[in-house]
Curated annotation (Swiss-Prot):
It is found in: Cytoplasm. One of its GO terms (biological process) is protein unfolding. Residues 438-556 are annotated as: Disordered. It comes from Synechococcus sp. (strain JA-2-3B'a(2-13)) (Cyanobacteria bacterium Yellowstone B-Prime). This is Trigger factor. It catalyses: [protein]-peptidylproline (omega=180) = [protein]-peptidylproline (omega=0).
Amino acid sequence: MQVTQEKRPGSRVGLKIVVEADRVKRSYEKTLRQLEQNIQIPGFRKGKAPRNLVVRQVGRERILASAVDDLINEAIQQAFKEAQLTPISRFELDDEVGQLLAQFNPEADFSFSGYVEVYPEARVGQYKGLTVTATRVDVKPEQIDQLIDRWRDQRATLLPVEDRPAQLGDVVVIDFAARDAEGNPLDEMTTQDFQLELKEDNFIPGFVAGIVGMQLDETKEIAATFPDDYFRKELAGKTVTFIVCLREIKAKELPELDDAFVQEISSFQTVAELREHLQKRLEQDALRQSEENLETAILNAILETTEVDLPETLIEQETTQLLAQSLQALRQEGIKPGELRKFLSELPPETLNQLKERHRPEAIDRLRRTLALSAIVRQEQIAVGSTELDVEVEEVMAAYAQQGQKLDRERVRQAVYESLLTNKVMAWLKSQTTVNWVDSEGNPTQAPTSLAGSEEKVEVPEAEFEADEPEAEVSGIPEAVESSSETATGAETDGEAAAAEAEPATEKAVEASPAETVSASAAEATLPVEEKAAETATEIPAAEKPKPSKKDKKGK
């Protein structure tokens, strides 16, 4: 057998394969014998009918198709081994099957060509002796108050309002319908008893502003414009008229910030203790964010001189994974897996494709980073020791075992290995880089103090490694993994989100869960498995709701 290789765009390898006549004949004879042994012809025992009757019964075209299919499959597997190829896609023929059948002759050589996509290798330019600028993150005094106020807001009591119009900060219940610029109704945007918190950045731009000032039971037309990047392209940038009826207005009454409140939301006894703890956590988060900023700056500099030809198969896989991660927000809102699968299954194909297309640029960026780091690892012969890996795996397994969670050890081992390897290559790159630190205003500043004992460890998303849990798949989108913590709503400043996750207002536990103590490398989309929060892929975004600890009051 003769095999000729050629490089094709998109990390494809073209193969032209010529199979010698004697092998073609043997393959054809093998196909015939298999048919003879399995076909039942009246008047003959199975396997005993004359060949000419078998050919007549089965049909020459079917026999040829079976013979050609077997021959091609055997030939390409051998070609992969000889060429030392590890395909990541199916072999695609250059010619139509009918064309190959027409040229097939059991007594002659048989040739065909096609291609497969293979895992690409990045061509990295300069990665030693870099000079980069990184932003140092510092804790601002108001961040502690913002976190505490957010928890107070989550536990607010909702009080009915009847004597004034709606204002920012209220929670309202509305009915609404919608029509487009031509006056056509948009039935999918019609709903009743929709609860919405009146925040300037909530819902579709212009919608909240239109509700502010409305009186109870008032009906009003509100023009709102969808963002230009809205996932439904037919609505992106378009102005829609909503007919809104205001059913209820509720004002939020926040709990007093005292020791009793602190004891309710945490294991601390006093406000002072909570503030001291938050200060330390925010400082740690600021240091981590500074490190992440440095890693991002280094990776961006490396990518400027990195060339990689990404195959469409990898881009599709990464895009699908990002979309699955974005659906975590739905799980956090309390939507059950079955409901989520139903939601996905009912999405029109074009809508699903639009959702995936939104993640394509990020998918490409993540893949380029991963492949660039992989190339540096090979070039510099950076490795993870088996003892180091075993110790880390045991720590992760033990941490989750304490919570009664059963993990797949091999998958944990792979994730931990990738994380450790990423941490090692990033540490090596930092040692080779000159860093100019600046503050948030861009002014030169000192380097942040290194984290004490800061060994980067893999973050282990629970659903990534749960054993005996089949992965659901609807329209190519794996079931969204369940987030290990709930991010508080509202604007977040540097370090604030992580601190909020570490100290949820709805939990008393102060110590972080395993997913929090086992922190991921800041090199966002590199070698380790990681999660990243993304926008909820809902058509009409769900309103952020306060989380009162008591039922709505009818009055004070």
